[in-house]
Design a protein with these regions (language model features):
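Binuclear metal-dependent hydrolase catalytic cores
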Residues: 1-193
């Protein structure tokens, strides 16, 4: 039987619990929401907190909850809209230069290359030289690769699975962008969980 409860946060967000699965919404708004932030969540179980997406308003929302981006150990990203990745550059740079640490990034491999080359490289790569080259994504993250799985679905889609500290996560390819494309092959790579 599912034991579900909704609780109002009365103090700063605690990123660990007694081992039960909890989901906290950093925001519930649309891409352009200024008051209720963007639709980004934190999955918490035991000592593990997994942030799912981190949009442009997420650093501010996290600060209001008593944390900064150095509190992030695990990050899943679903697609490259700014309301889902707009705060990631701050995570990368703040952790590298403020705390000399890397976070765990959990995304399917085909999306990792898109994420870096088409979204994050310009703001992160040119911060310094390392061995006479600009930085790459592995200078900022410990990459954890979900494994592709075969699921019999009515149309061809990519599915991936990973277990992070007892939390099973399945990624499934979505038809999100562009909105007028009907075939999955014509869509930019995006995922749901």
């Amino acid at each position: 039987m599912l034991n579900l409860s909704i609780k109002k946060l009365e103090q700063s967000l605690v990123l660990k619990n007694d081992g039960y699965l909890s989901i906290f919404f950093l925001g519930t708004g649309s891409a352009f929401s200024k008051k209720i932030y963007q639709n980004n969540i934190v999955i918490i179980k035991g000592d593990t907190a997994i942030f799912v997406d981190f949009g442009t308003r997420s650093p501010f929302a996290l600060n209001l909850l008593g944390h900064n981006v150095s509190s992030i150990d695990n990050l899943i990203l679903t697609h490259s809209h700014a309301d889902h990745i707009g705060g990631v550059e701050e995570i990368f740079l703040f952790n590298r230069y403020g705390f000399n640490r890397k976070i765990n990034l959990i995304v399917p491999k085909p999306y990792l290359d898109i994420l870096w080359e088409e979204s994050l490289k310009g703001g992160c790569s040119y911060s310094e030289y390392k061995d006479t080259k600009h930085l790459n994504i592995y200078d900022f993250v410990n990459y954890i690769e979900p494994q592709i799985i075969d699921i019999d679905y009515k149309e061809k889609r990519l599915f991936y699975k990973i277990n992070i500290s007892g939390i099973d996560i399945i990624f499934f390819q979505t038809k999100h962008l562009p909105s007028d494309a009907y075939e999955i092959e014509k869509h930019h790579l995006t995922f749901g969980l």
